[in-house]
Amino acid sequence: MTAQLQTSGNAKTVLVTGGAGYIGSHTVVELIENGYECVVVDNLSNSSYDSVARLEILTKHHIPFHKVDLCDREGLEKVFKEHEIDSVIHFAGLKAVGESTQIPLRYYHNNILGTLVLLELMQQYKVSKFVFSSSATVYGDATRFPDMIPIPEECPLGPTNPYGNTKYAIEKILNDLYNSDKASWKFSILRYFNPIGAHPSGLIGEDPLGIPNNLLPYMAQVAVGRREKLYIFGDDYDSRDGTPIRDYIHVVDLAKGHIAALKYLDAYNQKEGLCREWNLGSGKGSTVFEVYRAFCKASGIDLPYEVTGRRAGDVLNLTA
């Protein structure tokens, strides 16, 4: 089958770390549809090679894949040697807020060290364009400031959990690296909110290997009988129904945002480089109960649920 798959000739090659994962896989589709070639690196800790195979079916393109952990410098350098990388979109990393409060050292080691190894190799191989998958968790509890909901990019940062701290630390690293050599780097930092949904083909979507950390896949697993009930973490927040408010953005829209950010870097031709942050959200906040009721209505299933205590590190409102 691979021999029949297309390539795009002299197209620019983008290294997509975490490209077998939820957001990464959808972004690979958009990259190929926009004329880029992709190389996917993933350690498959929360995904499977099946998603890469599905991407090849979906795009009718051969997609080089390397099972490599970013902390493995030798393994990652082989990828840079084998492919002429033009730019990097960096998704790879641990990403569960609650879990990060339980195993913080693993989060700091994996997310920060992996990014450092990646940046060092980019510097060594003179790859200057970098789109970073950051998170709205870097803002922490924006309600502690007046007039900061919806959250603007200039909102003061203050993450409330180790996961958010790793994203904040990486943002600081990128700013420091840019300021050390402004002519050599172009950085797009994308702070996004809560991705949901799946590709319209139905071939790819959010299907984590373990217990889902996001609301929609958890509800889906309850609906098909893989989980007994939905757990709602807290109904005593100062919201319209007591549950936290989140900004849910469709994953395909989010993927298109990464393409826009990369094209912005491609077209940016100023003497100095760039290091800029953007929020990616829908601009509309919905409570957990509102999403729950919408899911039940759409599926025709009244999902069983149980309200438990608040999850460590969660905040009231994250809306773009």
Regions found by a protein language model. Give the residues of each.
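The catalytic Tyr-centered alpha-helix of NAD(P)H-dependent dehydrogenases
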Residues: 159-166, 208-215, 247-251
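Pocket-edge positions in alpha/beta enzyme catalytic cores
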Residues: 68, 80, 107, 207-211, ...
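Secondary-structure transition/hinge residues
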Residues: 126, 178, 182, 200, ...
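Hydrophobic, Gly/Ser/Ala-rich alpha-helical and linker tracts in large acyl-processing enzymes
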Residues: 199-212, 219-222
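N-terminal Rossmann-like NAD(P)+-binding domain of SDR-like oxidoreductases, especially those catalyzing
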Residues: 1-198
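Short helix-coil transition/hinge motifs at the ends and kinks of transmembrane helices
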Residues: 144-148, 201-202, 268-272
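C-terminal substrate-binding subdomain of Rossmann-fold SDR/epimerase-dehydratase oxidoreductases
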Residues: 215-320
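Oxidoreductase cofactor-interface core, primarily capturing Rossmann-like NAD(P)-dependent enzymes
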Residues: 190, 201, 229-232
